[in-house]
Swiss-Prot record:
This is Small ribosomal subunit protein uS2. One of its GO terms (biological process) is translation. Keywords: Ribonucleoprotein, Ribosomal protein. It comes from Streptococcus pyogenes serotype M1. PROSITE patterns: RIBOSOMAL_S2_1.
Amino acid sequence: MAVISMKQLLEAGVHFGHQTRRWNPKMAKYIFTERNGIHVIDLQQTVKLADQAYEFVRDAAANDAVILFVGTKKQAAEAVADEATRAGQYFINHRWLGGTLTNWGTIQKRIARLKEIKRMEEEGTFDVLPKKEVALLNKQRARLEKFLGGIEDMPRIPDVMYVVDPHKEQIAVKEAKKLGIPVVAMVDTNADPDDIDIIIPANDDAIRAVKLITAKLADAIIEGRQGEDADVAFEADTQADSIEEIVEVVEGDNA
């Protein structure tokens, strides 16, 4: 049984691609049709590729892989943080700092500074410092937490990276590829899939779509770590909606 059903994908709006004028021709094989100026993603492929992504992530997690979730746009930020945390993994959901992976040593120094400031507060150092200095330290901590809080406890560069919208996260993807880190990604019709190891063709602009895919990959990690099926609810009618019905839905929604 597929880890995500056609019905779930439809309800989350995963089938909606970008306007046809904004497409990347390299995504042509993942597009079923065009309706009302919008590309319609071939969800039959999404179902199969989501299965592949699930299996890959599950197996990686079973081997104690460090997995980094990346999604910095507003539609992805909350799901990326919530699901990575639920799976006991790591995330970046604000601006990607150049060199996060390729200059890991420098990033570790910034993380060490974040931990130092937290320790100063816990040990009562803030109580004996001038208010102005404490305010500056709090400002520094807030900024460091915003950009690095999700990887504060990451023990090493990741073994796998999951990305929402590789078109936006091009720098992150390039760093991963430079270091040989496999990338699993939600790829919309405007993106270049060439640098992605496991592509999940999907609408990466809808919050529900991002949440659905991201949660399933978090489930895969949990299953891999536990060595048993995660508590995932599957739809029994996996093939309840055909690709032809998807077109009808799109036409109705864009009427």
